[in-house]
Amino acid sequence: MLENQLNLLDKLFEEWKKTDSQEFGSDSHFAFSKDGIICSDEYGKNNPKLLFIAKEPNAGGVYNSDIFWIKNFLTDKSQKKSLFSNRIVMMSNCYYNTDLGYDVLRKISYMNLKKTAGSSRCNYNNLKKYCANEERRKFIKREIEILSPDLIVCCGNDVKKILYNIFCNNINYKLICVKHPSYFFISNLAYKNDFESKIVRKRRK
């Protein structure tokens, strides 16, 4: 089943990449960044499937379509950690009730709504325009369908608003929304407590 998911994702990304290249051309600053399943050996294995959805890749000056940045933490332990990545790990360990550090990323999936690199601050109008394209709306829905998550975590309210727009306010997935993981005006403890409380409420439904 998982091998089929990976094949479906590859086919989807090829179509998606063609659509993006028609708009952005071959400019390396708009290289298409694949995402999805982080570790094919672990995703969904005796666990509920957790999907984090963010706005766009933050390339940090490196534009390479072969780089799935969050996956690199598993192969390059020296890679610099960020507040964003630390909180993705924190929420994942909290959700699975584990203490695996960054290895917990093997259990989850991760996707960006926009597949071309952004900067340190997302331009929301550009993001809305990107996601308003009818083909891309289908691609976003299709990727979520392939990943078939038991829970979606929206990384920021902008993500939630766009998803509700894409699904016409009829999302058939369990979904919670957290503050953007890079939001530094809240402590990690308060951030974790907020995530836990939302998980508890969602599990009661």
Predicted regions and their residues:
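Short, solvent-exposed loop/turn segments at secondary-structure junctions
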Residues: 55-60, 114-118, 157-161, 180-184
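Mobile, glycine- and charge-enriched loop segments
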Residues: 47-52, 62-133, 198
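A short helix->loop->beta-strand "cap" motif at the edges of active sites that frequently abuts
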Residues: 48, 149-151, 170-175
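C-terminal capping/extension of enzyme domains
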Residues: 1-20, 121-141, 159-205
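Active-site and ligand/interface coordination hotspots across diverse enzymes
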Residues: 1-84, 139, 143, 165-168, ...
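Proline-aspartate-enriched helix->loop->beta-strand connector
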Residues: 140-155
